[in-house]
């Protein structure tokens, strides 16, 4: 016997929420793939300074996002099918998956909040080491290539106004093509550009996580209400 009345409304409401959840999973997967292959971050995080690679903490978070997006699409489909079929087993499985996903999202959110400044900090340290080697040692070709990539990608020169002046005077070939001492002094420094690059992307990820968490809470409530409604309708 199918559900009737308010329970039937909840059934279709849950279907709509699950469809939105499935779409959100697709969006997160798409955004994660875009962040993974974004030219700016790819240019910077694929660099190597001697035997030392650029920090990859940012990519760890991106790979987690890719996995989350794929799982969300599967769970969203499971919820849609369970709601339409009025299956307590599928809805119970769906609820369990949601609880696990929600717990993982909370854990990832805490990790992200704790490490939100660490990613940019590690990249800035990597850049500073390369810049120091490039300015001091004329034969440090690897370091020069790393610094040049940072400067061309971010359109900056030096980690501060002082280093911008020093680099422009001593090693102007490390600065972006077509720049001069005056233009370099009025540009944002590379430390600020690195902060802006990663904080903007982390802000986008944070908004997506909050939206998904709200949807998941509603889905958990609706799935349990529908499950109880199906059980009661089968009794009568």
UniProtKB/Swiss-Prot annotation:
One Gene Ontology MF term: integrin binding
Membrane topology, Extracellular segments: 34-63, 113-201
Cytoplasmic side: 1-12, 85-89, 225-236
Binding-site residues for cholesterol, renumbered to this chain: 219
Mutation effect (residue 188 to K/Q): Strongly reduced affinity for HCV protein E2
Tissue expression: Expressed on B cells (at protein level). Expressed in hepatocytes (at protein level). Expressed in monocytes/macrophages (at protein level). Expressed on both naive and memory CD4-positive T cells (at protein level).
Known outcome of mutating residue 144 to E: Reduces binding to integrin
Superkingdom of origin: Eukaryota
Similarity field: Belongs to the tetraspanin (TM4SF) family.
Domain notes: Binds cholesterol in a cavity lined by the transmembrane spans.
Name by which UniProt lists this protein: CD81 antigen
């Amino acid at each position: 016997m199918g559900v009737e009345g308010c329970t039937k409304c909840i059934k279709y409401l849950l279907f709509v929420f699950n469809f939105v959840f499935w779409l959100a999973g697709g969006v997160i997967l798409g955004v994660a793939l875009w962040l993974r292959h974004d030219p700016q971050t790819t240019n910077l995080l694929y660099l190597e300074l001697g035997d030392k690679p650029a920090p990859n903490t940012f990519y760890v978070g991106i790979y987690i996002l890719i996995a989350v997006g794929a799982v969300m699409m599967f769970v969203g489909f499971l919820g849609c099918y369970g709601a339409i079929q009025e299956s307590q087993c599928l809805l119970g499985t769906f609820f369990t998956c949601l609880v696990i996903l929600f717990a993982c999202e909370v854990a990832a959110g805490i990790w992200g909040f704790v490490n939100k400044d660490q990613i940019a900090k590690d990249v800035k340290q990597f850049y500073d080491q390369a810049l120091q080697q490039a300015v001091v040692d004329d034969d440090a070709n690897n370091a020069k290539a790393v610094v040049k990539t940072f400067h061309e990608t971010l359109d900056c020169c030096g980690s501060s106004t002082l280093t911008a002046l020093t680099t422009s005077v001593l090693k102007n070939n490390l600065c972006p093509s077509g720049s001069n001492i005056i233009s370099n002094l009025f540009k944002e420094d590379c430390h600020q550009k690195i902060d802006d690059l990663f904080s903007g992307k982390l802000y986008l990820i944070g908004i997506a996580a909050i939206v998904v968490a709200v949807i998941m809470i509603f889905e958990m409530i609706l799935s349990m209400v529908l499950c109880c409604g199906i059980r009661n309708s089968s009794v009568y």
